Amino acid sequence: MSTINIESLDQDTKDEPKEQTQEDNNEVLKVLEEKINMMDPKNTSGDTEVVITNFLKSKKEVKWYVALLVIRVFAFVFCLIAFSVLGASEQRVLVSENLTNWYSSGFTIQTPYEFHWYKWDEFRYSFAANVIGFVYSGLQICHLVMYLITKKHTINPKLQGYFNVAIDQTLAYILMSASSSAATAAHLLKDYWLEHGADTFIEMANASVSMSFLAFGAFALASLVSGIILCRFT
């Protein structure tokens, strides 16, 4: 009889910690529920689902805004390199020319030629387009950084979305047009002036055109991402 009592006592002592932990967990859950109800007494299961949905939506929205920020940084850098290289493209070459007149058999003179980007309308067009894209991208980067920090829009997000899509598409078309015209001018210069020693100017012009085309691609991609943000999150 004593052994049975001892075994039952041992089993009771083993079960007591389990029951105690369950009671503690139940008390913790009750306290949490009371705190939630105190914070929002009208909270229901439907409201909780809405909150969770909005939270997941905001996380996706932040990811798209981060992607847009990265694209705008690339556009900013490409435009900066494009107009910086084009603005520095200057060269002076000496071209040998043979002259013949009635009193001599002919002689050779060296005529200096100076190459400056602002002497061609195509290069001026490309320079202006990249400067505009550079300034616009810088302003957009500042705005996106401010939004990611504060999570607040400075203006109506729908209105801003329409503005972003319109300006991104416009600048993409302008950069494509400017890059194409500058590439044509550089190709025409290469056909004649490359053999006369103007290779440095032509190479810098081609490098600027390449960066301008990359800036066009960045703005086209930014327009696409801005449209996705406008359609899905505003």
Curated annotation (Swiss-Prot):
<dbReference type="GO" id="GO:0005886">
    <property type="term" value="C:plasma membrane"/>
</dbReference>
<feature type="region of interest" description="Disordered">
    <location>
        <begin position="1"/>
        <end position="24"/>
    </location>
</feature>
<dbReference type="Pfam" id="PF04535">
    <property type="entry name" value="CASP_dom"/>
</dbReference>
<feature type="transmembrane region" description="Helical">
    <location>
        <begin position="129"/>
        <end position="149"/>
    </location>
</feature>
<keyword id="KW-0812">Transmembrane</keyword>
<feature type="glycosylation site" description="N-linked (GlcNAc...) asparagine">
    <location>
        <position position="206"/>
    </location>
</feature>
<feature type="topological domain" description="Cytoplasmic">
    <location>
        <begin position="1"/>
        <end position="65"/>
    </location>
</feature>
<protein>
    <recommendedName>
        <fullName>CASP-like protein N24</fullName>
    </recommendedName>
</protein>
<comment type="subunit">
    <text>Homodimer and heterodimers.</text>
</comment>
<keyword id="KW-0325">Glycoprotein</keyword>
<feature type="topological domain" description="Cytoplasmic">
    <location>
        <begin position="232"/>
        <end position="234"/>
    </location>
</feature>
<dbReference type="InterPro" id="IPR006702">
    <property type="entry name" value="CASP_dom"/>
</dbReference>
<feature type="topological domain" description="Cytoplasmic">
    <location>
        <begin position="150"/>
        <end position="169"/>
    </location>
</feature>
<feature type="transmembrane region" description="Helical">
    <location>
        <begin position="66"/>
        <end position="86"/>
    </location>
</feature>
<keyword id="KW-1133">Transmembrane helix</keyword>
<feature type="topological domain" description="Extracellular">
    <location>
        <begin position="190"/>
        <end position="210"/>
    </location>
</feature>
<feature type="glycosylation site" description="N-linked (GlcNAc...) asparagine">
    <location>
        <position position="98"/>
    </location>
</feature>
<feature type="topological domain" description="Extracellular">
    <location>
        <begin position="87"/>
        <end position="128"/>
    </location>
</feature>
<feature type="compositionally biased region" description="Basic and acidic residues">
    <location>
        <begin position="11"/>
        <end position="21"/>
    </location>
</feature>
<keyword id="KW-1003">Cell membrane</keyword>
<feature type="transmembrane region" description="Helical">
    <location>
        <begin position="211"/>
        <end position="231"/>
    </location>
</feature>
<comment type="similarity">
    <text>Belongs to the Casparian strip membrane proteins (CASP) family.</text>
</comment>
<keyword id="KW-0472">Membrane</keyword>
<feature type="transmembrane region" description="Helical">
    <location>
        <begin position="170"/>
        <end position="189"/>
    </location>
</feature>
